[in-house]
Regions:
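Generic recognition of long tandem-repeat/solenoid scaffolds
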Residues: 172, 271, 286-288
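A short local loop/turn or secondary-structure capping micro-motif enriched for an aromatic residue
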Residues: 98, 212, 233-235, 263-266, ...
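Surface-exposed loop/turn motifs in large extracellular/passenger domains
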Residues: 1, 5-28, 34-54, 59-76, ...
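Surface-exposed loop/turn positions within long extracellular repeat scaffolds
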Residues: 240-246, 254-266, 279-281
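Extracellular, surface-exposed repeat architectures
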Residues: 224, 259, 275-287
Length: 288
């Protein structure tokens, strides 16, 4: 059995500072930058950090990890993972991931580039996760750009270039899971996401299942081109309220590429309907 390892590894609440390193890992379950039980703080400035194995993100966080002005590449894995009450903060980084359809530990559940979740293994304290990226580029070669399950989290993007090479991949998927990996109880393991686009341009579809919630805010001249859909939980879980709440602040825009279903809408900006509709939870159908 191969135990998880990392190029830069922090455990037990320690603090690690690294500057302008070249780090490469080749084994499976070997993130280039990772933390383990006990949390801690990791600060990385500049450099190149590459993982080549399966189940080996460029960054796996069970701590508070900040990376600035660096290149982060996962050649056979999702790029980034946040587990539990922890965080990843990126500034002006070039990030790319290429998760396998079959060889990733969670490939049977979802293929993605950034995963935010609670594993229930005891590796990470339960609580609200945080992911923030300012500037730089985030490239996904396969699957969804963001996948969130069995946790609460805040996602903030500002001035990031987003690229998804998989035409079928979602920009964001917020759902429960089958619990086959121990991530909560099927039908009760949805996610709660607060997503803020701040001076951000983004394109792609968002999907939220009926046991999960999304609170999306577009601010500071952000533009979102895509759809939002509420879908049934695959395991028949009891639906919750406020599955998809959207706020568009002054100067920001939502460009629809298809019909949408959301719970409620506060619009002080602009919506380009392009012939499509938005259906609210109370049955109201909005048209251009």
């Amino acid at each position: 059995m191969r135990l998880p390892s990392g190029g830069i590894q922090t455990t037990g609440g320690g603090t690690t500072n690294a500057t302008n390193l070249t780090v490469e890992t080749n084994g499976n379950s070997s993130a280039a930058i990772r933390s383990d039980r006990g949390g801690g703080t990791v600060n990385v400035e500049k450099g190149t950090y590459t993982s080549k194995g399966y189940n080996s993100p460029a960054v796996y966080s069970t701590a508070n990890i900040t990376v600035k002005n660096a290149a982060l590449t996962a050649e056979n894995s999702e790029a980034l993972v946040v587990e539990g009450k922890n965080s990843i903060t990126l500034e002006n980084c070039d990030v790319s991931g290429s998760m396998s359809d079959s060889k990733g530990t969670s490939s049977s559940e979802n293929v993605h580039n950034v995963m935010i979740y609670q594993s229930m293994s005891g590796d990470a304290e339960t609580g609200t996760a945080n992911f923030s990226m300012t500037g730089g580029k985030l490239t996904s070669s396969n699957g969804d750009q963001f996948y969130v399950t069995n946790t609460d989290c805040n996602i903030t993007l500002s001035g990031v270039t987003l690229v998804n090479k998989d035409k079928d991949g979602k920009l964001l998927r917020v759902t429960g899971n089958s619990a086959s990996h121990g991530w909560g109880t099927a039908g009760k393991n949805g996610a709660q996401v607060t997503f803020t686009a701040d001076a951000q341009t983004m394109e792609g579809d968002m999907e939220v299942d009926s046991i999960s919630t999304l609170d999306l805010t577009l601010k500071n001249n952000s533009t979102f081109t895509g759809t939002i859909q509420i879908v049934d939980n695959a395991d028949g879980g009891t639906a919750v309220e406020n599955n998809a709440v959207v706020t568009i602040e002054k100067g920001s825009k939502w460009v629809l590429t298809g019909d949408c279903t959301i719970t409620s809408l506060t619009n002080n900006g602009t919506i380009d309907f392009n012939g499509h509709t938005i259906t609210l939870a109370d049955g109201t159908v909005l048209k251009g």
